[in-house]
From Swiss-Prot:
GO MF term list: 4 iron, 4 sulfur cluster binding; lipoate synthase activity; metal ion binding
Major location (coarse): cytoplasm
Protein name: Lipoyl synthase
Reactions performed catalytically: [[Fe-S] cluster scaffold protein carrying a second [4Fe-4S](2+) cluster] + N(6)-octanoyl-L-lysyl-[protein] + 2 oxidized [2Fe-2S]-[ferredoxin] + 2 S-adenosyl-L-methionine + 4 H(+) = [[Fe-S] cluster scaffold protein] + N(6)-[(R)-dihydrolipoyl]-L-lysyl-[protein] + 4 Fe(3+) + 2 hydrogen sulfide + 2 5'-deoxyadenosine + 2 L-methionine + 2 reduced [2Fe-2S]-[ferredoxin]
EC number: 2.8.1.8
GO-annotated cellular components: cytoplasm
HAMAP family for the chain: Lipoyl_synth
Residue stretches making up the Radical SAM core domain: 66-280
Record pathway: Protein modification; protein lipoylation via endogenous pathway; protein N(6)-(lipoyl)lysine from octanoyl-[acyl-carrier-protein]: step 2/2
Organism: Leptospira borgpetersenii serovar Hardjo-bovis (strain JB197)
Cofactor note: Binds 2 [4Fe-4S] clusters per subunit. One cluster is coordinated with 3 cysteines and an exchangeable S-adenosyl-L-methionine.
Keywords noted in UniProt: 4Fe-4S, Cytoplasm, Iron, Iron-sulfur, Metal-binding, S-adenosyl-L-methionine, Transferase
Residues annotated as binding [4Fe-4S] cluster 1: C54, C59, C65, S291
């Protein structure tokens, strides 16, 4: 069920996105209905009343990922306390945390037989710890049921509160992921409640603690290639090992307008550049998202 808050205009803009080029047009395939992994994942999530960033953020890769029996669980409800101009997750006043949610995430992951679980959350600035303890509890119960499963946490910045970050560190995720999302100049327009330096600080602290760190950017929001490269150097400077680069796709006419559709050759150029400056893995392409083929990104190193 679509949250009615998603229908509220996200910005003052009212501009339909330009037609997508061929390389961004996703071809949907419909497997055998008797053995349909997409339906299996959807039924598992609906049965457990779980949210995913796949649906809440209108990800273009939903069918592809679900056909591989992978999904990114989204904790804390489906209402975010922040209002980024590009994001399709509903914004507003969230409900109280569902204390049974961690258990249901674990049950779903076990039922799907996942070997790599990605767990994220909406921003919960209304909570003292930003939802960190809820992350930790979820990791604990998933590990109990799937001891050999790799766990990747895609976390908010927690406003760089040391106590919140320490809760995350104590649960020892296999991958610590925090997306910077865009270049420094665009933060006031794209993510006005976030700060570029704050995101870098979070990643630096995690790297210094010895965690495998990962971040990502969305391109096509008005940045230049040189600004992207500058951001990549900033990320290397704070110890980030894995990077994802993908194309911004405008969810509705009231969201931040797409400024450009970045050519596949530019994504390739940025991948090569990222490898040259020290990233262990750079997953770069128009339809790449932070958790797209996340299980492969850890070892993906062409």
């Amino acid at each position: 069920m679509i949250n009615p808050l998603k229908k509220k205009p996200r910005t003052h803009f009212l501009q339909k996105a330009p037609e997508k080029p061929d390389w961004l047009k996703v071809k949907l395939t419909f497997p055998d209905p008797k053995n349909n992994p997409v339906a299996i994942v959807r039924n598992s999530l609906e049965k457990k009343k779980l949210n995913t960033v796949c649906e809440s953020a209108s990800c273009p890769n939903l069918n592809h990922c679900w056909s591989r029996k992978t999904a990114t669980y989204m904790l804390g409800g489906d209402i975010c306390t922040r209002r980024c101009s590009y994001c399709d997750v509903a914004s507003g006043k969230p409900s109280a945390l569902d204390r049974d949610e961690p258990k249901r995430v674990a049950e779903s992951a076990i039922a799907l037989g996942l070997k790599h679980v990605v767990i994220t959350a909406v921003n919960r600035d209304d909570l003292e710890d930003g939802g960190a303890a809820h992350f930790a509890e979820t990791v604990e119960v998933v590990r109990e049921g799937l001891p050999d499963c790799k766990i990747e946490l895609l976390v908010p910045d927690f406003k760089v509160r040391p106590e919140s970050l320490e809760i995350i560190f104590q649960c020892k995720p296999d991958i610590f992921n925090h997306n910077v999302e865009t270049i420094k100049r665009l933060f006031p327009e794209v993510a006005p409640q976030k700060k570029y330096e704050r995101s870098l600080d979070v990643l630096k602290i995690a790297s210094e603690k010895g965690f495998l760190t990962k971040s990502g950017l969305i391109l096509g929001m008005g940045e230049t290639v040189e600004e992207v490269k500058e951001c990549m150097r900033d990320l290397i400077g704070v110890g980030v090992s894995l990077l994802t680069l993908g194309q911004y796709l405008q969810p509705t006419p009231t969201h931040l307008p797409v400024k450009s559709y970045v050519l596949p050759e530019v994504f390739q150029e940025l991948r090569i550049y990222g490898k040259s400056i020290g990233f262990k893995g750079v997953f770069s392409g128009p339809l790449v998202r932070s958790s797209y083929h996340a299980d492969e990104q850890v070892s993906w190193n062409p």
